[in-house]
């Protein structure tokens, strides 16, 4: 019997690299697609690309995802060879926030937005589950501790 991770790897093996090209070609991807690809970018530790939004800058995960999908065959191979044993606690905490606990990022919604993105979502979830089961299960504790450190109640956060 295949584990969840092994099953998702089989799905990635069957994933047509042209699907990455199709996703990359979207000029205005649905939010569910953006969310899943933000998770992919997070796992692959892509260098941030910033875009200006009014007066502040934000990380543009969509541009980062397009850059990651520039070579579809390489991305597919990278997903198949992904070092799931060395995913950082910060990456797992972010995946938990944007994918695992996000009620707008269900398999049904992602499939309705882009069936091609569903395999990527399932792969991300299986990497996360593998990490939690294999001992990186202190994600929630570390994440809560990080939030407490970053946002102390007696020190207001400056908003730009």
Residue ranges and their predicted role:
Residues 2-160:
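Extended alpha-helical scaffold/assembly modules in large eukaryotic proteins
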């Amino acid at each position: 019997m295949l584990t969840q991770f092994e099953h998702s790897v089989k799905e990635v093996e069957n994933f047509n690299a042209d699907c990455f090209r199709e996703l990359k070609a979207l000029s205005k991807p649905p939010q569910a697609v953006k969310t899943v690809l933000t998770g992919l970018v997070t796992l692959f530790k892509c260098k941030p690309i910033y875009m200006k939004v009014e007066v502040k800058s934000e990380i543009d995960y969509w541009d980062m995802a397009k850059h990651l999908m520039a070579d579809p065959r390489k991305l597919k191979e990278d997903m198949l060879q992904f070092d799931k044993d060395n995913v950082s606690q910060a990456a797992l905490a972010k995946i938990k926030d944007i994918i695992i606990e996000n009620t707008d990022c269900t398999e049904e919604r992602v499939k309705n937005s882009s069936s091609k993105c569903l395999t990527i979502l399932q792969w991300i979830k299986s990497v996360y589950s593998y990490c939690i089961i294999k001992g990186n299960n202190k994600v929630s504790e570390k994440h809560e501790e990080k939030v407490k450190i970053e946002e102390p109640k007696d020190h207001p956060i400056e908003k730009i």
